Amino acid sequence: MQNLNNKQKTLIIFLGIITFGIFIIYFFTKAKKVSQIRNTHLIVSSNIPFSLNDFYNCIGSKNNLVNVDATINTLKIELKEINALNNEKLKVLGAKGIMCNQTKISIIFGDFCLELKELIKKDLFS
């Protein structure tokens, strides 16, 4: 840069700033596109970390069940006798939360509740 006059030095600095600006704009728009990509795949586990008999022991027995339903992470059960429910055993099995009313309970287990519901329905109605 020793042989360049002031006009050439200014032009080099100006072109450097323009090039840097183009790179910044390119990377910010690319990052914005990547951040707007949505995950369209729902991850549901089919691995149940306890046996079905252990679960039946926690709710009294298999015969205590009236109805079972589930969302992704919550198991909703209707029982004949709510007094047979053992909250402490359910927590040992991995329940993160338990909500009760007169005959229905909602148990938050995790992403395997849909699989657990299907197993219980197969066991009850087969």
From Swiss-Prot:
<comment type="similarity">
    <text>To M.genitalium MG129 and M.pneumoniae MPN268.</text>
</comment>
<feature type="transmembrane region" description="Helical">
    <location>
        <begin position="11"/>
        <end position="31"/>
    </location>
</feature>
<dbReference type="InterPro" id="IPR001996">
    <property type="entry name" value="PTS_IIB_1"/>
</dbReference>
<comment type="function">
    <text>The phosphoenolpyruvate-dependent sugar phosphotransferase system (PTS), a major carbohydrate active -transport system, catalyzes the phosphorylation of incoming sugar substrates concomitant with their translocation across the cell membrane.</text>
</comment>
<dbReference type="GO" id="GO:0016020">
    <property type="term" value="C:membrane"/>
</dbReference>
<dbReference type="GO" id="GO:0008982">
    <property type="term" value="F:protein-N(PI)-phosphohistidine-sugar phosphotransferase activity"/>
</dbReference>
<keyword id="KW-0597">Phosphoprotein</keyword>
<keyword id="KW-1133">Transmembrane helix</keyword>
<keyword id="KW-0472">Membrane</keyword>
<keyword id="KW-0598">Phosphotransferase system</keyword>
<keyword id="KW-0812">Transmembrane</keyword>
<dbReference type="InterPro" id="IPR036878">
    <property type="entry name" value="Glu_permease_IIB"/>
</dbReference>
<keyword id="KW-0808">Transferase</keyword>
<protein>
    <recommendedName>
        <fullName>Putative phosphotransferase enzyme IIB component UU178</fullName>
        <ecNumber>2.7.1.-</ecNumber>
    </recommendedName>
</protein>
<feature type="domain" description="PTS EIIB type-1">
    <location>
        <begin position="49"/>
        <end position="126"/>
    </location>
</feature>
<dbReference type="GO" id="GO:0009401">
    <property type="term" value="P:phosphoenolpyruvate-dependent sugar phosphotransferase system"/>
</dbReference>
